[in-house]
Amino acid sequence: MVAEHATAGAVDGPAATRPRIRVQGAVKSFSGRVVVDVDDLVLGNQPIEGLIGPNGAGKTTLMRMIMHSTPLDRGRISLLPADGREVMLSSLAAHRMSRHGVVKSNQVIMDFDKLTIWDSLLLAVAEASYEQPHRIFSERTVFQRHEDEIRHYLDYFGFADPTAFAMSAGEKKLLDIVRCLLLKPSFLLLDEPTAGLPEDQTEKVMTVIRDVAGGGTSVVIVEHDLNVIWNLCGEVHFMAEGSVVLRGDPQSIREHRTVVEKYLGEGHV
């Protein structure tokens, strides 16, 4: 692989103090076609890492395999927490991932149409703090424990009326990101977190990502807006045809001939 070591990104922090995820011999096929075939991949050596590649490279499928929402055909995926106690993610039910600090945003936005913005976020903090969902709505003291944190994110992203429903794709995207943050992840997977957002909100999302990584969370981003990748990530993994074929610091990846030919095109270095 190119660039066997990556330069430090915008956020510092040794890998030993952060959780990592290891993917070993992970294969997934659909209708006889192999869409992911990853021999050995470690995510989390840098505070913020990027996963890029052309459409159909297997990026989102790999993220879903990590979350076990798409089961592996073979192989294993494990969480290596900072305390060293390995957790076999590929043996966990998808709904138990957040209990181990592994949280993923959604490329296809969750359906928030049946809950108000406020109620959607209350459910997230209920899950994060292991509260019974009904208590957070019915008991004032439980509600008050989480009110300030929710209001912070609502104000930061400019949700004008939290008692309303998230209507636009952009609002739903931001609401999904806030939901992830309220779950207090130790390892955060973000699938196209800035897709469709205006420039000012993209900048806010980037700031939040830096902040959460600065607090000790490992972050991996799948993103087609490469300015986000180049500006945030300390290490970038390049996927093509289901495999991770290159990894390195952003500069070495963006200049590599394979990336230019298969993804960027001439004139984009």
Task: Label each residue range with its predicted role.
Residues 2-8, 13-269:
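Glycine-rich phosphate-binding loops of nucleotide-dependent enzymes
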